UniProtKB/Swiss-Prot annotation:
Pfam families: Zn_ribbon_Dof (PF02701). Zn(2+) binds at residues 31, 34, 56, 59. Residues 1-29, 70-116 are annotated as: Disordered. The gene is DOF1.6. Residues 89-116 have a biased composition (Low complexity). One of its GO terms (cellular component) is nucleus. The keyword Zinc applies. Residues 20-29 have a biased composition (Pro residues). GO terms for biological process: regulation of DNA-templated transcription. It comes from Arabidopsis thaliana. Transcription factor that binds specifically to a 5'-AA[AG]G-3' consensus core sequence. It is found in: Nucleus. Keywords: DNA-binding, Metal-binding, Nucleus, Transcription, Transcription regulation, Zinc, Zinc-finger. This is Dof zinc finger protein DOF1.6.
Length: 209
């Protein structure tokens, strides 16, 4: 059966905020958390008008009158001050300058190493033999123990020339010989021999052409 045109369907009336006006309070409600009176009534996002929603400016929290407390903080905090930005920028600049100084210090180390290598090279090239390096660490230029150009006969229990308590008396051939190089021991000639009596090693020098 068709409905009559004059008959209208009942429409549902949406609740409005006029039915629940905000409470007229002489003084704002204190915050239930911090007891601060810097609170306000929330006109927006106040879905349950039977429990009006409030906001505390001190602790930045919402709460509903007659409801439970919410521990959810307000999103989107305040902007950072310019002083904090300047402080962070200065800290970054200081760290970058310190890192550059460290790099500068490390680049100066190879120069010192090259100088020491050059010094050692000059010492080797100046003496001209490996035996000269043995006397670099001694206090008297290698004259104590015969590690350099010195003879060191007494310190090594060999004795000077003319001392008969040792046994074989080495005779150095010439005036420029080293401790380990002698020219003649008891008639042995034509080569170089070690000066120690128990470690006599002869090195024959044959004229090979």
């Amino acid at each position: 059966m068709p409905s009559e045109p004059n008959q209208t369907r009942p429409t549902r009336v949406q609740p409005s905020t006029a039915a629940y006006p905000p409470p007229n309070l002489a003084e704002p409600l204190p915050c239930p958390r911090c007891n601060s009176t810097t609170t306000k009534f929330c006109y927006y996002n106040n879905y349950n008008l039977a429990q009006p929603r409030y906001y505390c400016k001190s602790c930045r929290r919402y709460w509903t009158q007659g409801g439970t407390l919410r521990d959810v903080p307000v999103g989107g905090g305040t902007r950072r001050s310019s002083s904090k930005r300047h402080r962070s920028f200065s800290t970054t600049a200081t760290s970058s300058s310190s890192s550059s100084s460290v790099i500068t210090t490390t680049t100066q180390e190879p120069a010192t190493t090259e100088a020491s290598q050059t010094k050692v090279t000059n010492l080797i090239s100046g003496h001209g033999s490996f035996a000269s390096l043995l006397g670099l660490g001694s206090g008297n230029g290698g004259l104590d123990y015969g590690f350099g150009y010195g003879y060191g006969l007494e310190e090594m229990s060999i004795g000077y020339l003319g001392d008969s308590s040792v046994g074989e008396i080495p005779v150095v051939d010439g005036c420029g010989g080293d401790t380990w190089q002698i020219g003649e021991i008891e008639g042995k000639s034509g080569g170089d021999s070690l000066i120690w009596p128990g470690l006599e090693i002869s090195m024959q020098t044959n004229d090979v052409k």
